[in-house]
Amino acid sequence: MMLYIVFILSVIFVMGFVGFSSKPSPIYGGLGLIVSGGVGCGIVLNFGGSFLGLMVFLIYLGGMMVVFGYTTAMATEQYPEIWLSNKAVLGAFVTGLLMEFFMVYYVLKDKEVEVVFEFNGLGDWVIYDTGDSGFFSEEAMGIAALYSYGTWLVIVTGWSLLIGVVVIMEITRGN
């Protein structure tokens, strides 16, 4: 049952990116990214990454909603173009959806393509050794490693996001 849920989420994930790539208006492109980001967080949650899924959902989608809200407020069209208004855009959208549905049909009919998620040899990536101290949450150890070894990474990431918002605001400000 869980495999089918992940499979359906993966199809919605790809459909969101198809909608983004064939966007006729920036409003619908942002909507496709938001849908794909939310569904991607659901896929991460399904594989046990509850903290990572929640943080990506809150930070990525929250920040993207703020930037998307500002940019669409400054560059809104009076009559936005939809997928059905242009034949080339509609053709790209339908082609992407058909390719996705053919892939789904192929996987479900023949079952020759298998989903493999096996991670062997990840012991080289372990920073903290828990030893014989019992059960530890992998997410808590990852967050501890991020803030102890990755302090500069957190600072550079936060600064990059701030500069990205400022650049987008300057570009969309107009004349």
UniProtKB/Swiss-Prot annotation:
Core subunit of respiratory chain NADH dehydrogenase (Complex I) which is composed of 45 different subunits. It comes from the Eukaryota. GO terms for molecular function: NADH dehydrogenase (ubiquinone) activity. GO terms for cellular component: mitochondrial inner membrane; mitochondrion; respiratory chain complex I. One of its GO terms (biological process) is mitochondrial respiratory chain complex I assembly. It is a multi-pass membrane protein. It holds the Pfam family Oxidored_q3. Keywords: Electron transport, Membrane, Mitochondrion, Mitochondrion inner membrane, NAD, Respiratory chain, Translocase, Transmembrane, Transmembrane helix, Transport, Ubiquinone. It is found in: Mitochondrion inner membrane. Core subunit of the mitochondrial membrane respiratory chain NADH dehydrogenase (Complex I) which catalyzes electron transfer from NADH through the respiratory chain, using ubiquinone as an electron acceptor. Essential for the catalytic activity and assembly of complex I. The chain crosses the membrane at residues 1-21, 25-45, 47-67, 88-108, 149-169. It catalyses: a ubiquinone + NADH + 5 H(+)(in) = a ubiquinol + NAD(+) + 4 H(+)(out). Belongs to the complex I subunit 6 family. Its EC number is 7.1.1.2. InterPro entries: ComplexI_Subunit6, NADH_UbQ/plastoQ_OxRdtase_su6, Nuo/plastoQ_OxRdtase_6_NuoJ. This is NADH-ubiquinone oxidoreductase chain 6. It comes from Bos taurus. The keyword Transport applies.
